[in-house]
Structure formats: structure tokens, C-alpha cells
Amino acid sequence: MEHTKTRHCGQAGVQDAFRLDAVRDDAGRKALFARMCREGLTGCAMYAWADPREEDWLRLVSAPGRLLLQATAPDGTVLACGLFSPWRGQVREFDFTVFRPAFPLAVPLARAAFRRVFRQTGTSALWGLCPVSNRHAWHLATACSFVITGRLPAACWLARRGVHVDGIQLLCTPETLEHAVAASPSGPRAPQ
């Protein structure tokens, strides 16, 4: 993993310093998958697989051009991970998973990861498609600065249930991110 300086989330009253690291080795990738399995999060993070296996995860996150970030607390506890995949041009598709103990920090963790992706990869926008049934995920995405750009009929395949459901299409740009940060109760963060 590559070390980055500690980031502060910009959420008043929260002890929220953490590191963002790029996960570039299979040991780190496997540890994230094992954590998702232990916390029962693979059904949301990998909804298109009926029974996601470690090799599915490794194939997904290690494909060319993909960036897997991990947020880690100062004590070494992994808080979240985000997968950013090439989609079209300079737009990347995103998937962001917050581990259960860090749920209260989901918004600042995600915003910090999105900011890093914009600043370090030349990404012009982040795009996502979330099953309508995963309300918590798309509500969280809008809190993190994504804009709902549409509802696409039967766009998501829920493999475990064997059904198509509508998808909520989401888009975040550097501008929507900065606007959301500036409008947050704690105000904008110091430049990094």
C-alpha cells in the first residue's frame, strides 16, 4: 500500500483522522474481501454475483485501470474501501463500502476518497448505478455529493434473488463534491 498523509474528514466534533492508501497487492485485496464477508456486506458490494467468491473479487479489483482505495484509522483499523473503475473517457464508475463500525463516518470517508480520485487521476466525474432496493446506499451517495440523474428500469441484476430491479443512476463531479463540502454543517475543509 502506498501511504498518504492523514486526512481530516471535516465533520465537526468527530475524531476522524484517517489515511487513504491504494491497495496494490493481493494480500490487501483478500483482507478487504474477508472483512466484507465477515460483516455481511458482499450482498451489497457485489450484488451481481449470486455467491461472490474471493477469486471473483480479485478479478474485479485487479483489472487494468482500477483503483482500490482503503481508509484506515490511526490505530490500523480498516474503515472503508472504494473501487474506482474506468467507465467512459475520464469518467470512473465507483463502488464504496464502509465497514459497520465506521458507518457514522461514511460521508466524510467517501468525500475524502472522491476528492483524492479527482485530484490524482484526472477523473472528470464519478458514475454509479445502485439498485433501487439498496436505498441506504443511494441515500448515502446523495449525502456524499452525488446527484441522482435518473431511474433506469430493470437496470440492475440482483443475482441472489434472480431478479432485475430498477437502478438509480448517480453522478458526482468535482464541482458537486466541493459544493456539498462547502454546504456541510462543518463548512469547507482546509486545502490539502
PLM features per residue range, with description:
Residues 46-66:
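Active-site rim helix/loop that mediates acceptor-substrate recognition in acyltransferases
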Residues 89-101, 129-131:
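Conserved acetyl-CoA binding element of GNAT-fold acetyltransferases
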Residues 127-142, 155:
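Conserved beta-strand-loop-alpha-helix junction that forms the acyl-donor binding cleft
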Residues 1-28, 176-192:
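Conserved N-terminal entry element of GNAT/NAT acetyltransferase domains
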Residues 27-50:
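Helix-loop element at the rim of GNAT/NAT acetyltransferase active sites that forms part
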